[in-house]
């Protein structure tokens, strides 16, 4: 039954209930349920290692963590390329082999907790023009990431 026909027949309660149910389901869909494994490197890994890893794995970003697994920052391949091409960091291979990636991270890293609703993560990504966002547990340890592709995979079922 269409919405217009439901209104004519006095069936607005049925439509309202289903809308409330959908809204509730959207709020209950958390990042923990849909997140992907994080592309992760240690903060002491060299810039050269990270550049090679991004190219070899065909990744567009990596999350940088410390020795406890806590999120330190995020490095996007395009941002790293811009740093190198604009000569903000030395292009010398020897230099890139000894300088840690922590020197090129985006700080502070934007992150959400595992229990954050997916809609909140999607809103943050759109607001801050990010393709992905880190997901951490209550201790701040990196547990995964959510991307536009994840959002596109899970939210359309609520819209149709």
Question: Each PLM stretch: what is its role?
Answer:
Residues 1-160:
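Tandem CBS (Cystathionine beta-synthase) repeat/Bateman regulatory domains
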